[in-house]
Amino acid sequence: DYPKLTFTTS
């Protein structure tokens, strides 16, 4: 989840 996991910019 990009909105939640901002560090995980897949």
From Swiss-Prot:
The keyword Metal-binding does not apply. Keywords: Apoptosis, Disulfide bond, Glycoprotein, Plant defense, Toxin. Glycosylated. GO terms for molecular function: toxin activity. It comes from the Eukaryota. The keyword Heme does not apply. GO terms for biological process: defense response. Significantly inhibits growth and induces an apoptotic response in HeLa cells through cell-cycle arrest at S-phase. Exhibits highly cytotoxic activities against cancer cell and non-cancer cell lines producing IC(50) values of 0.15 nM for human cervical carcinoma cells (HeLa), 7.71 nM for rat pheochromocytoma-12 cells (PC-12), 11.20 nM for human breast cancer cells (MCF-7), 15.80 nM for human leukemia cells (K562), 2.79 nM for African green monkey kidney cells (Vero) and 3.92 nM for normal Madin-Darby canine kidney cells (MDCK). Heterodimer of an A chain and a B chain; disulfide-linked. This is Malanin chain A. It comes from Malania oleifera (Garlic-fruit tree). The lineage of its organism: Eukaryota, Viridiplantae, Streptophyta, Embryophyta, Tracheophyta.
